[in-house]
C-alpha cells in the first residue's frame, strides 16, 4: 500500500470526520483519480512531437498515455478531424497515491520561484486543477534528453461536495497552498 494511502486511512479520515462532523467514514471525501493531460498544438507540423510527449508522460505517470485526437476540423488551426493533438493518462489506486506523493514532495519544490499553489483553482464541485509549465520538475525526466519544454494540466478529482471540503482534504495531504 502506498505511503499516502496509509496516511489517508490512519490520519486524514479521522481529522476530516472531526472537522466536518461526518456520521460515517464513507462520507469523508477521498481522491478518486488524477488525470495528466498534455495539449500539443505543435504536433500538427511534426508527428515525432507526439512520440516524445508520450514518452515523457509514460516516465512521469508510470503508465502509457492515450493519444487524444481532434474531434472536429478547425480550419483556422489547420486541424483535421482525427489528427493527434495531445495525450492524457488517468491514474487511480496505488499508482495515483504514488504519483501524488512524488508530486507533493519532489516535483512541486523543484518549480522555479515556487511560493505555493493557488487555493482558488477549485471548480465548485470539489475538484482541483494545476497547470505545470515544464515537465522537467519531475525527477524521472532527464534535462539533457528532452527535445522541448512542455507543460501539462493535472486534474485531481475528489468525492468532496464543496470546495472547502476538497481544500481541507488536499491540505491534509500537505499540499503547499499559498496563504
Swiss-Prot record:
Gene Ontology biological process terms in this record: translation
Cited HAMAP family: Ribosomal_uL5_B
Molecular function GO terms recorded: rRNA binding; structural constituent of ribosome; tRNA binding
Subunit details: Part of the 50S ribosomal subunit; part of the 5S rRNA/L5/L18/L25 subcomplex. Contacts the 5S rRNA and the P site tRNA. Forms a bridge to the 30S subunit in the 70S ribosome.
Keyword Ribonucleoprotein attached: yes
Described function: This is one of the proteins that bind and probably mediate the attachment of the 5S RNA into the large ribosomal subunit, where it forms part of the central protuberance. In the 70S ribosome it contacts protein S13 of the 30S subunit (bridge B1b), connecting the 2 subunits; this bridge is implicated in subunit movement. Contacts the P site tRNA; the 5S rRNA and some of its associated proteins might help stabilize positioning of ribosome-bound tRNAs.
Pfam families: Ribosomal_L5, Ribosomal_L5_C
Keywords: Ribonucleoprotein, Ribosomal protein, RNA-binding, rRNA-binding, tRNA-binding
Identification of the protein by name: Large ribosomal subunit protein uL5
Top-level taxon of the source organism: Bacteria
GO CC annotation: ribonucleoprotein complex; ribosome
Cited SUPFAM superfamilies: RL5-like
Record-linked InterPro entries: Ribosomal_uL5 (IPR002132), Ribosomal_uL5_bac-type (IPR020930), Ribosomal_uL5_C (IPR031309), Ribosomal_uL5_CS (IPR020929), Ribosomal_uL5_dom_sf (IPR022803), Ribosomal_uL5_N (IPR031310)
Family designation: Belongs to the universal ribosomal protein uL5 family.
Amino acid at each position: 500500500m502506498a505511503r499516502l494511502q496509509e496516511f489517508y486511512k490512519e490520519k486524514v479520515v479521522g481529522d476530516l470526520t472531526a472537522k466536518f462532523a461526518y456520521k460515517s467514514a464513507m462520507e469523508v471525501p477521498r481522491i478518486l483519480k488524477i488525470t495528466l493531460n498534455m495539449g500539443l498544438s505543435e504536433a500538427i507540423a511534426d508527428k515525432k512531437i507526439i512520440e516524445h510527449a508520450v514518452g515523457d508522460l509514460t516516465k512521469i505517470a508510470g503508465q502509457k498515455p492515450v493519444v487524444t485526437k481532434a474531434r472536429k476540423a478547425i480550419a483556422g488551426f489547420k486541424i483535421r478531424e482525427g489528427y493527434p493533438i495531445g495525450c492524457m493518462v488517468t491514474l487511480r489506486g496505488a499508482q495515483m497515491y504514488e504519483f501524488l506523493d512524488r508530486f507533493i514532495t519532489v516535483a512541486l519544490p523543484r518549480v522555479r520561484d515556487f511560493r505555493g499553489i493557488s487555493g482558488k483553482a477549485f471548480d465548485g464541485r470539489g475538484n482541483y486543477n494545476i497547470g505545470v509549465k515544464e515537465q522537467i520538475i519531475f525527477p524521472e525526466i532527464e534535462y539533457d534528453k528532452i527535445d522541448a519544454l512542455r507543460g501539462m494540466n493535472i486534474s485531481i478529482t475528489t468525492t468532496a461536495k464543496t470546495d472547502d471540503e476538497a481544500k481541507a482534504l488536499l491540505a491534509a495531504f500537505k499540499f503547499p497552498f499559498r496563504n
